[in-house]
């Protein structure tokens, strides 16, 4: 029996890499399907080799996991956020941050396409970047004329860790990965001018070795499209709200219409950016309007 990490999943096959660098193609035992378990990229597993194909016998408990894309045991998630083509959208970035907070994955914000901004627009985004740093997030904003320093800082964050890249389609995920390691030869997405959206270029979830890092480039990242928690739990995923909410007069304050709300006071004083509070209110209403999810009961009657 050997232990390794799943680095690729495709059509029912799982490629596993061991600590010694051996790569073994495997399938999962039927018992996993019967118990509702399914191996995903990033899983640590026990497996046996049988001729060309191996068999997965055990999946170790996960530290964290995402559903869309299916990947587990992530150290950091790099949110590649375009500043132009497509234009920067604070609401989208906040939605991605909330999804990662809920999944217990550490976010890193990387602003792309800074070279397309005017001097005035770049100055404005510098202030926004600092707002996110004050919340506690790691933010990388490349210089307006090149991104070499920001790329080097990103590489140092990636080394020795498992990372996933996410962001709006066309934000430049594959372009950034190619810059980090040109030998990858990942196909770069072409932005559709008619739709102002990028064409998907990555077709499978794969962990790729880049220097001392394992990086996942994924076929569409949509874990942030649906909130799988209650509206009452939303403030748990806004770190700056968590930092001050004990000062609210009422326990369970929703930070909307309640008097003596420490969060609203922090917003009025400028300690919490108004854009973040607006995102919170929008997400709260969105969650409230979502249809309840019902889990399927698989018992036989």
UniProtKB/Swiss-Prot annotation:
Q: Which residues bind Zn(2+)?
A: 248, 253, 255, 261
Residues forming coiled coils: none
Output the GO biological process annotations, alphabetical, semicolon-separated: ribosomal small subunit biogenesis
Cellular component GO terms, alphabetically?
A: cytoplasm
- Tagged with keyword Nucleotide-binding: yes
Q: GO MF terms on file?
A: GTP binding; GTPase activity; metal ion binding; rRNA binding
Domain called CP-type G: residue spans: 63-224
First-listed, main subcellular location of the protein, grouped into a coarse class? cytoplasm
Q: Which PANTHER family match?
A: SMALL RIBOSOMAL SUBUNIT BIOGENESIS GTPASE RSGA, SMALL RIBOSOMAL SUBUNIT BIOGENESIS GTPASE RSGA 1, MITOCHONDRIAL-RELATED
Describe its assembly. Monomer. Associates with 30S ribosomal subunit, binds 16S rRNA.
**What name appears for this protein in its UniProt entry?**
Small ribosomal subunit biogenesis GTPase RsgA
